[in-house]
């Protein structure tokens, strides 16, 4: 399983709404925004080892870029694990941690957009 994660999802919502939902998802999951470009619908956040009361074991950096896609928007999410001094972890990462954070982030983003949750 790769340590880095890349996912793209298309939503039938405008880019501004998707970006705002991403900000709320970051806040809900306890992430800290380290950079953002609201005019370009882009953010980068760092997440702690423990999220929603569950200890995952690694810090994670996640970036989300939203682009217009026809009548909706495309959310592009990239994430990777961080070491103790917040550098990209190149080896020794726990399997599944980064994927879990990306999955939770997208689930919260979709909830904030008012979309039904997947079964």
Task: Label every PLM stretch briefly.
Residues 1-119:
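Ser/Thr-rich, low-complexity intrinsically disordered terminal regions
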């Amino acid at each position: 399983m790769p340590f880095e994660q890349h996912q793209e999802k298309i939503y039938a919502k405008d880019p501004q709404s998707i970006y705002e939902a991403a900000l709320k998802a970051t806040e809900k999951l306890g992430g800290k925004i380290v950079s953002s470009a609201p005019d370009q619908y882009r953010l980068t956040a760092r997440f702690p080892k423990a999220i929603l009361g569950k200890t995952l074991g690694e810090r994670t950096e996640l970036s989300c870029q939203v682009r217009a896609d026809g009548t909706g928007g495309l959310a592009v999410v990239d994430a990777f694990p961080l070491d103790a001094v917040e550098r990209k972890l190149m080896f020794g990462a726990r399997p599944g941690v980064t994927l879990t954070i990306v999955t939770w982030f997208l689930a919260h983003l979709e909830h904030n957009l008012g979309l039904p949750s997947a079964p």
